[in-house]
Amino acid sequence: MIAELEGIDIRENEALKHYTYTQVGGPADFLAFPRNHYELSRIVDYANHNHIPWMVLGNASNLIVRDGGIRGFVIMFDKLNAVRLNGYTLEAEAGANLIETTKVAKFHSLTGFEFACGIPGSIGGAVFMNAGAYGGEIAHIFLSAKVLTPEGKIKKISAREMAFGYRHSVIQETGDIVISAKFALKPGNHDSICQEMNRLNHLRKLKQPLEFPSCGSVFKRPPGHFAGQLIMDANLKGHRVGGVEVSKKHAGFMINVADGSAKDYEDLIAHVIRTVEQASGVRLEPEVRIIGESL
């Protein structure tokens, strides 16, 4: 227990595989769950003052944590998950579940968030990655965000300043951490919104291996191609390294089928990149983030 942070939920040497969608990942020195912005500021101030590294993990849905884990503080926003409506503006804290947030919009007959109805992860991670699917993306509805700078200061970032691109935002370079975000929605027909969300969720169940642990879509879509098709054309569907396999259902996914490790994921990703480039001349770029230390 760290005396200066008494009262905050902090767990020492906690295995991160219990918190990641891939079910892989070594220990964090300190895993912290702040309940509010004050506790978050206390953690960051303490870490910065004592020169201890810190990072925010989010919901760890499009992420691989290496088997050696992460040094310093890993902060999770599970308890910072409030969702509020002000007219047609929806504001959500960074730890709010993305799928559950789309249900709030649906309940109030607000349209614009349907594309995200089946995307796993948190609001903070969705903004960070400019998450998207089926023609929609966060950039289309984003208004502004409150962020925590690496120095521990809170500031506001506009949609223009966020400089969204394909699976990209400026905070991937600046190191700013989303605390909350506002989205501009529109009044819609409740039945139409429900039908569209049901349609998209049906497509996901048909095409994606949702029954297995995975990190979601592994590669960005290369211009003029589909990553999954390139992987299939290279005869890699079902290819396995250790306990991790290229999904037979959707080659753009890698699934943990037999107690796989982060190293299995990394080795399989590297093999797929090499083989696809040799077969097609196209070099795939990972969409998934890989962090932490190797064993």
From Swiss-Prot:
Main location: cytoplasm
Keyword Membrane: no
Gene Ontology biological process terms from the UniProt entry: cell division; cell wall organization; peptidoglycan biosynthetic process; regulation of cell shape
Reactions the enzyme catalyzes: UDP-N-acetyl-alpha-D-muramate + NADP(+) = UDP-N-acetyl-3-O-(1-carboxyvinyl)-alpha-D-glucosamine + NADPH + H(+)
GO CC, alphabetical: cytosol
Bilayer-crossing regions: none
EC number: 1.3.1.98
InterPro entries, A to Z: FAD-bd_PCMH, FAD-bd_PCMH-like_sf, FAD-bd_PCMH_sub1, FAD-bd_PCMH_sub2, MurB, MurB_C, MurB_C_sf, Oxid_FAD_bind_N
Enzyme class: oxidoreductase
Pfam families listed in its UniProt record: FAD_binding_4 (PF01565), MurB_C (PF02873)
Residue numbers annotated as active site: 167, 217, 287
Co-factor(s): FAD
Keyword field contains Cell division: yes
Key words of the record: Cell cycle, Cell division, Cell shape, Cell wall biogenesis/degradation, Cytoplasm, FAD, Flavoprotein, NADP, Oxidoreductase, Peptidoglycan synthesis
Location in or out of the cell: Cytoplasm
UniProt GO molecular function: FAD binding; UDP-N-acetylmuramate dehydrogenase activity
Domain annotation FAD-binding PCMH-type: ranges: 23-188
Protein family membership: Belongs to the MurB family.
HAMAP family: MurB (MF_00037)
Role, per record: Cell wall formation.
Name of the protein this chain belongs to: UDP-N-acetylenolpyruvoylglucosamine reductase
Source species of the chain: Streptococcus equi subsp. equi (strain 4047)
